[in-house]
Amino acid sequence: MKNINLKFLISIFLMLVFSGCDKKHGGDFERTAPNKNPFPSTYQIKQHAPFLIKNAKILDGLGNKLENTDILIENGKIKDVGVSLKNNTNYTEIDASNTWITPGLIDVHSHMGVYAAPGTSNHSDGNEMTSPVTAEVWAEHSVWPGDPQFEKALAGGVTTLLILPGSGNLIGGRGVTLKNIPSITVQGMKFPGAPYSLKMACGENPKRVYGSRNMLPSTRMGNMAGYRKAWIEALEYKQEWDDYLNNSSDKPISNAPKRDLRMETLKGVLEGDIKVHNHCYRADEMVQMIDMSKEFGYRITAFHHTIEGYKVAPILAKEGICAVMWADWWGFKQEAFDMVRENIALVDYAGACAVIHSDDAIQIQRLNQEIAKAMSAGTRMGLDISPAKALRWATSNAATALGLEDKIGSIEVGKNADIVLWNGDPFSIYTKASKVWIDGSLFFDIDNPDITRTADFNLGILEPGERRP
């Protein structure tokens, strides 16, 4: 009994001692707002020697085609673009005659890393289907950097990806923008300064998941009620924090609102820090989501899948909302039936921000061919779509959807040197990416397999130390 009393007294003493550790000199607690970026990028540009690409045929990602043009790369950036650039400092030259150059391709809808290969249930980490609203979860905490699918996408010229949670929930959580580079940690892949995103989902998926459990939502009206309830709570949470921070000098920390990870993400959307990426197929539901965003004062950055985008293309253009679409994937469920192959071309023709995506670990390897299919469909119906314009769907327009248009998506002076050299016309089924640079460093070379990372999984099961440097 004496030992128990002694332990009790010691524990009380330690509690009293450490309870004062957070106090300032005046006896009050330190006032701190929630950290908006608790898991910052640790990505570092890989050092490389400056080099000069000569005599290239370039699709610049902005809708232009440049002939016999040179690109000077230095310190991870595009330093100069022009004809017959002089090499006054003996930079390494790459003769790009008879080849094509494009910006690195951008896929704004991927689940690689959260649905990693091999596709076992143990690797199914993309849908936190335990509540219709899970804004508190972050895709980056599920990403496995060792997913062997990343290297396959790199071989297809994809240099930047938005990794999203799945669409089983009304509000599924935060997405993360990654550079397609080898890394032990996901933070080593995170694109520095990229805005966070929020995945929302319309339609069949949430009502199917929770309706099967006799929960709300089980209908589309239940979907809308669920979103609105969450945004009402978020507005109240934001107001509580605004009131506290605006008057924090007069209030002790004990009066600060209790932190809520779910509400913090939604508050970030309301403050414009987090971009909404909204899975939505039907035209009528897209308009409903736009109306709701105006009700609560947030902005939708992009609709994803957007099967019926062609029906509301002028509205998307007016609202400044990107439409992220497949070339010809449709009909796999009821809400995906009313699709036309000219969808992307028609949205682009209306002046909206048209973007192509994969949502698939196979299609991402051939995103250039997906662009070609969508371009051909538009051309057949009489729209004037050049290959240079179509490329914007996976370059500058995609960069806009990520909020990174000032850094990637085009061959321009000052942009990141994310560049793909193709061994032929990028839209030919016979063409492959020959070299892929990210921030000026070569990460893929079709003629030098040692350049490209090999995922640990692809090495097979080895004895410790076997066949390892």
What are these regions (language model features)?
Residues 35-36, 40-48, 58, 62-102:
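Histidine-rich, glycine-flanked metal-binding segment
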Residues 18-20:
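C-terminal motif of bacterial Sec signal peptides marking the signal peptidase cleavage site
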Residues 41-42, 117-118, 124-130, 134-137, ...:
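His/Asp/Glu-enriched, well-ordered alpha-helical/loop segment
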Residues 56, 400, 412-456:
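C-terminal cap of metal-dependent C-N hydrolases
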Residues 149, 154-302, 432, 438, ...:
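Polyanionic/metal-chelating signatures
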Residues 56, 71, 76, 98, ...:
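Divalent metal-coordination and catalytic microenvironments
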Residues 1-10:
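Bacterial N-terminal signal peptides that target proteins for export
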